[in-house]
């Protein structure tokens, strides 16, 4: 777009539908271009081109289309894509979903402006995720180890304490090693004012805000803003990681609200719906977010992602968790059954998986016994869980002494390893030591997945 076109204001708005408006009689317009909008009463708003064909442009209005009409609304195409000003001064600040300060502080003086859509990384320029990220949560650090550069979602359900878990991870997460810089970028989408106040209070009272950048999009904010919030958060994370050499953990919650906004916008555009009404491009859209995690050759920093989503009706085959599972490297599943038992965090380790856990375990990363003792504990817990179903049918009297030991181990595992205080920050060494202590419940002959050397070194003597 040339300089002359940037000064032209169009009044040829032909239709307004939901958050979208259609402008006709234009030329030289590009997809993703930012639009300045002036309402009939002189208020300034911002939009983005969603579709450009021939002489027609479909524009999404970030602040909503209330008070706009087709006769008096003025539109100017800027020729620029959506950008955010980034700076290390963003650490310790809280912003709204569009990147405007929400904490009463001054505007950020940007070191540079960056396109919020990021830039595609050549796979050859990526390094495989490596090195341990400690969250202080035993069921993550121990059994589903998080690795720098990884993307691993948390699958939750309505009413489960995923917000509490997200805040705890944001407070406690750290990387090990001398002189390593660490930051958290936290983005909440479509949350209530009550949830927003909870997150802000948690970050402020614990001091976690000092190492964090927080973006909050409320449920009553425009759905369009929900689409750009995770992109702004990831752009900030990439800047801190690749230009400032920091290891950045990005927590995105709730991706279900993000996908609902995608569906709402697709419906307003009269697009042909895909599975359960979601747009057919939802897979590629989610991939454009998740694939921004990683390690880049020649760069010290890393971007690690924990997207959180609530599964509608606890259905793990729903399109949102289903497509997310194809793109990411595992999943952490919260269990309603464990939650009913009063267990926090209610992480069910059996369906949970970190496909890259091995990259963050072992000498120099965690401890030499990590992988083996977790394998042993996982197998024993799975057997104990299976025996509970048998007890429900035949009663505990029918069990052998061996079976009773595994049943006892499963109960103890949930009580000592899975169960953890909201403010309890466990090191990986503490987690592994607890597991070794619980393994004394089992006959030594059943410890087939750990070597005699490890048993001699770590198993407490009775």
From Swiss-Prot:
Keyword annotations from UniProtKB, A to Z: ATP synthesis, Cell membrane, Hydrogen ion transport, Ion transport, Membrane, Transport
Q: What is the lineage of its organism?
A: Archaea, Methanobacteriati, Methanobacteriota, Methanomada group, Methanococci
- Indicate the quaternary assembly: Has multiple subunits with at least A(3), B(3), C, D, E, F, H, I and proteolipid K(x).
InterPro entries noted in UniProt? ATP-synt_VA_C, ATPase_a/bsu_AS, ATPase_F1/V1/A1_a/bsu_N, ATPase_F1/V1/A1_a/bsu_nucl-bd, P-loop_NTPase, V-ATPase_su_B/beta
Q: Which domain of life is it from?
A: Archaea
| Record-level Gene Ontology MF annotations | ATP binding; proton-transporting ATP synthase activity, rotational mechanism
Whether Signal counts among this entry's keywords is no
GO BP, one annotated term: proton motive force-driven plasma membrane ATP synthesis
- Where mainly located? membrane
GO CC aspect terms = plasma membrane
Q: Where in the cell is it found?
A: Cell membrane
> What membrane topology is annotated for this entry?
Peripheral membrane protein
Its function, per the record, reads: Component of the A-type ATP synthase that produces ATP from ADP in the presence of a proton gradient across the membrane. The B chain is a regulatory subunit.
In this UniProt entry, which cysteines form S-S bonds?
A: none
By what name is this protein known?
A-type ATP synthase subunit B
Task: Name the family.
Answer: Belongs to the ATPase alpha/beta chains family.
